[in-house]
C-alpha cells in the first residue's frame, strides 16, 4: 500500500494539464493501479530499466518517450539526493528536489532548487522553470 503526501494528486492533476508526466521509480509499484496513475503518460521501473536510479538507463528510457526534448529541457522531481538529483543532474536534466524533511545538502555537486510541500509545486514550476 502506498500513501501519498498531501497535495500530490492535486499537483499532478494541475501539471498534467500543461506537461507530459512520466514516473521513474526504483520501486515495484504499478503507478497505473494508483489514483494518480491517470496523470502519467509513461512509467519506468527498475525492472524495465534493468537497473536502479541513479543509473542513466531510467533517464534514457524517459528520453525515448520525449524524443523532441533535449535533456536540458526536461525537469526531474525527486526526493533522493543521489538516486534522483545526482542521476538526473549527470545528464544535464534540471532537478527539483522534494525536501520535505528539510535535510541538509550533503553532496559535492550543485544543490538544486527544492520544495517542501506538494501544494506549492505547480506555482514553483511556473515561477522557476517556465520562463527559462
Give the ranges of each region predicted by the language model.
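Asp-based, Mg2+/Mn2+-dependent phosphohydrolase catalytic module
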Residues: 9, 13, 19-132
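Metal-dependent phosphoesterase signature
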Residues: 1-7
Amino acid at each position: 500500500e502506498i500513501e501519498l503526501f498531501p497535495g500530490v494528486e492535486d499537483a499532478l492533476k494541475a501539471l498534467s494539464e500543461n506537461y507530459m508526466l512520466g514516473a521513474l521509480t526504483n520501486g515495484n509499484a504499478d503507478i497505473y493501479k494508483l489514483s494518480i496513475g491517470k496523470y502519467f503518460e509513461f512509467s519506468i521501473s527498475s525492472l524495465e530499466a534493468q537497473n536502479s536510479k541513479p543509473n542513466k538507463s531510467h533517464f534514457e528510457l524517459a528520453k525515448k518517450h520525449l524524443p523532441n526534448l533535449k535533456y536540458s529541457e526536461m525537469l526531474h522531481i525527486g526526493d533522493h539526493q543521489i538516486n534522483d538529483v545526482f542521476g538526473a543532474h549527470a545528464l544535464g536534466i534540471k532537478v527539483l528536489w522534494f525536501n520535505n524533511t528539510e535535510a541538509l545538502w550533503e553532496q559535492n555537486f550543485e544543490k538544486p532548487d527544492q520544495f517542501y510541500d506538494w501544494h506549492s509545486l505547480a506555482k514553483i514550476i511556473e515561477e522557476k522553470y517556465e520562463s527559462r
